[in-house]
Amino acid sequence: MSKSFYVTTPIFYVNDAPHIGHAYTEVACDVLTRWHRQRGEDAFLLTGTDEHGEKVLRTALGNHTDPRSWTDKLVTESWLPLLETIDIDNQDFIRTTEPRHEVAVQKFLQDLYDKDFIYQGSFEGNYCVGCEEYKNDGDLIDGQGEFDGQRVCAIHSKPVEQLNETNYFFKLSEFQDRLLKHYEDNPTFVQPASAKNEVVSFVKQGLSDLSISRSKERFDWGIDIPWDSDHITYVWFDALLNYITAIGYGSDQEKLDLLWPADVQVVGKDILRFHAVIWPAMLMAAGLQPPKQVFGHGWLLVGGEKMSKSKLTGISPNQITDIFGSDAFRYYFMKAIGFGSDGSFSWEDLSARYNAELANGFGNLASRTVAMVTRYFDGIIPEPGEYLDADNQVMAVAKKA
């Protein structure tokens, strides 16, 4: 059996309900998958939710519940209904709290530990709970307003925390040369070109080993390190593995071979380094192929800022689909925003395009077609005739497009 065309959305962090930025990514991946499917290819779309980590735990406690109940509620009431709301035809939905994922993560960890790619050490640094990531000084900016005088995360605009921990580390630094060679040998591995340039520049500066565990003395919402029950797995190391645990890693080699490596992994540019640096290094360490391509799309902006629930700039997809419908939602975000670049959303632009391009453009075409069928064929669409050479030539060109 030939390999299926495998597309993944990013594994979405489930500390809150989805906004249109998440839906934008889902639609883009769905459109790509459907395009390959209509060409007669077998295509597989994976999406899902990342449910571990300190941020989820803090959010749950802030809502007077436990993290499992909190994530169950969000997935059931918000994330799964989103797929139906915007007509996503995914073949699987994985949650990182599922046993199939947790067991496979521990297998992967044990494999890397046995191969001497993991060791125990100490680390001190600036930690952003929102990003679930240690930050370099260059990743921080001066705070404003209530955070004036403090250094804050450039993405979340909130102060980082100074942490000193003894954790387990993945030998990421050993993969610098292999990664650079992979980028050179596979020039379309990271797309668009601006994203590739950023990744290559980052790796050339030198890579530090990656802390991949957290002590249970801090918090315990995560997957146990298999050889040390006093530690849980770093949420990003856990989350990245969903792309293979969902398709049979450690349990169904035939399915894994059918789908992996992924053909396209679509991510937001703010998590590009995880997917274009850490993720391929993890796979190389395990003896697995990296994905064929990682595409980092731009941010969806509202009022010049990245879409964010915490900054009250998050717009629910239902706010749009309840008025304009799913088809208009999908059309607008694929037409109005250049994929790979930042794009601004406004209600005025959506309404204008809906009227000019859908109602007046496609709407008039449909109306005239129905009128002609009614006038010349008694309202019955005639059976198609045989394809002529010109028809076949047009179809051949379309298939190569």
Residue map of PLM features:
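Hydrophobic faces of stable alpha-helices that mediate helix-helix packing
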Residues: V75-T76, Q176, G363-V370, D391, ...
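Acidic, turn-prone loop/beta-hairpin segments
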Residues: F377-K400
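Cys/His-rich short segments
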Residues: K115-Q176, L180
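Structured secondary-structure scaffolds
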Residues: S2-T47, R95, R100-A104, I155-R375
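A broadly conserved sequence feature marking short terminus-proximal activation segments
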Residues: W70-D139
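Short, charge-patterned binding micro-sites
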Residues: T49-K55, T59
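A charged helix-plus-loop insertion that forms the helical arch/lid used to bind
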Residues: T59-L74
